[in-house]
Amino acid sequence: MVEIKVIHGDITKMTVDAIVNAANTSLLGGGGVDGAIHRAAGPALLAACRPLHGCATGEAKITPGFRLPAKYVIHTPGPVWQGGQHNELQLLANSYRNSLNLAAENHCQTVAFPSISTGVYHFPLSIAAPLALKTLQATAQTTAHTVQTITIVCFDDQTQNVFSTALAALTN
């Protein structure tokens, strides 16, 4: 059984097999968690991302973690919220699902996720958190032979509260 937990913290300091980066489609760094991961990993991360030639929204690509405590960084561009009528829910679910599957393919037992798309991409946290957790729980059924622990690392108290409430509702 895969354990899913929610914590408040800094994803760049997580000692796990893989952290997930809420990237942009260029994979060349940006703001928010993407910028923080690139700064913490060092310039080798950008050099490793260049030959990947970007990544489509909802898809995932993997690089080494370089100076991070994590062995790998899994990059996934989440969708920009446009009111919910532009396939955003499916694209966000794809980001979580494809990232977890890629982690399993690379023999990762521990994976840390940020709250994808809820920052500058304005995805409503009240929709994103339950969707993320349901997707991860369902995907974990097929990756349980590899992935053992999934940690949602929340940057602030509000995000942690919403994810914790959604996780409690899902497990009850």
From Swiss-Prot:
Gene3D superfamilies: Leucine Aminopeptidase, subunit E, domain 1. Pfam families: Macro. It comes from the Bacteria. Residues 1-171 form the Macro domain. InterPro entries: Macro_dom, Macro_dom-like. PANTHER family: GANGLIOSIDE INDUCED DIFFERENTIATION ASSOCIATED PROTEIN 2-RELATED, MACRO DOMAIN-CONTAINING PROTEIN. Belongs to the MacroD-type family. This is Macro domain-containing protein lp_3408.
